[in-house]
Structure formats: C-alpha cells, structure tokens
Amino acid sequence: MLNQIMLVGLAALSLTACNKDAVEETAAPCGVEISSTAPAAGNSNFYYRGDIRVTLTDADSTAEISVDGVTGTSALAEDSKSLSFTPDAPLDPSTAYTFTVDYCGGSAPVDFTTSSLGTAIDDPSSLAGSVFALDLQADDVEIVIPAGVGSVLESYLEIALLLEVESADASTLQIFAALGKDSNGEEQEFCDPTLPFPDADFTGAPYFQLGPQTTTISAAGFDVEIRDLFISGTFASDGSYWGGGVLQGSVDTRPLVPLLEDCDSNESTPETDDDCEDGAICELVEGFGVACEDCGDGTDF
C-alpha cells in the first residue's frame, strides 16, 4: 500500500486571482466560454514568476495562450478545459502585459501588470537577521498538488514555518528554518530543532531556492517526515516581506492517521481499528482521485 503524498503549496495571491466578467471575448457559437483567468483582467499585482492560467466552461482542444512580446509554452490539461502559459524567462516586475486566449470562441485579450516583486535588492547583506513566516493555513496559501485535497491536508498542517536569514551577499544565501508555536508564527517552538539548509545560490536575487532536503517536523504533536523539502520565493526590494513562495515535498502520512476521526488511540474501537491502519489517509484521498506514492523504505505501507 502506498502512503506518501506529494505536497506543493503556493503563497501568492496574484497567482489565484480570477475574474470572468472583465475578460473581453469575441464570442462564436461553439458553446465554450472563459470561466476564469489568473491573472484577472486589470490585475496589478501578478507575480513575475507565475504561470498564467485559464479555465474554460467546456473542453476545447484548440485553446492556447500567448503573451505579447513574451516567449513561452502554452499547455492544455487532459480535460482540455484548463490551460496554462509558462514564460521562458521571468517577466519584468512592475510592467504591463497582455495575454490572449485563442479558442473556438475567438480571441480574448487580458491586460495585467506585474507586482514589484523581482525588483533588485540594493544591498543583499541587509537581509541578515530578518525573519519571515509561512503560515500553511493562511488564506493566500493554496495546496495545488495533489489537486482537490487542499482543504483536507490544510486541516492537519496547523503550523507556521519561520525562515531566518543568517547571511546574504550577491552570490550566496544562508538560511535556517524553525517551526512556530502556532499557525500565526509569532514565536518559535523552541522544543523542536531548527532546520538548517545548505548554502543557497543567490545569484538570481531577489529570488531564492532552498533544498531539496529531507527533514522531520512536528505537526499536531506528531513527528512527520518531509522528503525532498524545497522552498523558494522572492524577497521584496526593501527586504520587508517575501512572496511567490513555494513549499514542496513528499509527506509521510502514516504518523498522521491518529488525527482522523475515530482513529485517536484513546477513542478507537475494534469496529474502527480496521479503518485506522497506516494507509488510512491514502484511502481517504483516493476518494478525490489522488494516489499516494511508495514511501520507498521497504515497508508494506
């Protein structure tokens, strides 16, 4: 049985803003309309490293996205209703752009502007000593992989991840992470060890990447292993915040089984024990069309 879930979280409001009514469509009688776009028309805060995403009301195998003056790849999902555009290089910060959705209903241009994230930091060393928090239950955090189970997983991740910059220069970033006492991330949980990361390449500043590396964190009172933990994001030019954050890793769900209803060791009964085995969470998410991965540790689960 498989019981490891690949988790990818995004912390960027600009990546999820949607607006159907503001999109100007040149309609044709094909029965397909644009349901939503990200960024929405008129959005002025789009993350410069974000993918453009469009959802249609019905399948259209001809649909694609292009961006004026930008090279990239337009991709259509298996359902032919969702499509995305990935630029070959990051967009410029604080810059106006237009992307166009070409589909069976015609062409729909959408104007948007990138946020200031991506603007150069004058003195990278000024980041030293700064502490940043990632609240995994914040409204602007979206669990995108596995699709459809974000709300389920978020209920188990009542933690904040704190990142402190130890040092930074034009080429190297040194950061260590720690868990907050609660999801607000206002205070470190000193009973849990810090999570050191190897020195990171900072030549792409203000963008940074940490990991991947395997680590163990405490969640809801249980030690949970995250394999290949990877964190990335972009610091604001004045170092006051970071955005466009991505946290990615494979979570071993076995220690979290007692969090399921009726699986608490103090409340379980012979009637519920069969539903509380190591693969219980995997069986739960199977209902959302999500399959766990092999833990790869030689066990049966």
Regions found by a protein language model. Give the residues of each.
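Extracytosolic secretory-pathway proteins
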Residues: 23-27, 117-301
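Bacterial N-terminal signal peptides that target proteins for export
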Residues: 1-6
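Short beta-strand segments enriched for Tyr within beta-sheet-rich domains
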Residues: 91, 95-101
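N-terminal non-catalytic regions of secreted/periplasmic and cell-surface proteins
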Residues: 20-64, 103-126
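C-terminal motif of bacterial Sec signal peptides marking the signal peptidase cleavage site
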Residues: 14-17
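Aromatic sugar-binding surface patches on proteins
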Residues: 79-85
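Short beta-strand segments within Ig-like beta-sandwich modules, predominantly Fibronectin type-III
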Residues: 73-79
